[in-house]
A protein has these predicted regions:
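Short solvent-exposed beta->alpha transition segments
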Residues: 28, 46-81
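Surface-exposed, charged secondary-structure patches
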Residues: 68-106
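Short beta-strand edge/turn micro-motifs at domain boundaries
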Residues: 106-131
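Bacterial Sec-dependent N-terminal signal peptides
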Residues: 1-27
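Short, aromatic-enriched amphipathic alpha-helices that serve as compact interaction elements
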Residues: 25-38
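Solenoid-repeat scaffolds in large eukaryotic assemblies
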Residues: 41-43
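A mature extracytoplasmic/lumenal domain signature
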Residues: 46-48, 56-58, 86-88, 99-102, ...
């Protein structure tokens, strides 16, 4: 009986360790949307207001305004490749830093996600030209 309880507890611990990293990961759809230049998918993760820094735009914008600015950016800078360089976070907030290679050059991408009602929302997005 004790052996069975031990196995159950051990199994639960292993499952917890395997599952818990996925909660701290950046949603794959965000990475794909940046990689593919899909403003529609990316904006579905925008908070109602987004602090946005993209080219000459640097302000807090509504979700709709931010979507339009990002759409214009992707139209002018066709994405070729995107990869996450670093990510981290704590207490319901996560961030990622990535490198976006486009038809016009390479950009550093930073975004901050906060969780609300078990969903992740982008509160801050920065896309800045490198070099």
């Amino acid at each position: 009986m004790k052996n069975a309880k031990f196995k159950i507890i051990l199994l639960l611990l292993v499952m917890f360790v395997l599952v818990s990293p996925s909660f701290s990961q950046i949603p794959g759809e965000i990475v794909l949307s940046i990689q593919n230049g899909n403003d529609e998918m990316l904006s579905s993760y925008f908070n109602q207001n987004v602090e946005l820094v993209v080219e000459n735009n640097d302000d807090v914008f509504s979700k709709a305004q931010a979507k339009q600015i990002v759409a214009e950016f992707f139209k002018a800078n066709k994405p070729k490749q995107f990869s996450i360089i670093h990510q981290g976070g704590k207490d319901g907030a996560r961030y990622a830093i990535g490198s976006l290679v486009t038809s016009t050059g390479t950009f550093r991408v930073y975004f901050l996600l906060k969780s609300k009602d078990n969903n992740s929302y982008i509160h801050q997005l920065r896309i800045e030209k490198q070099g």
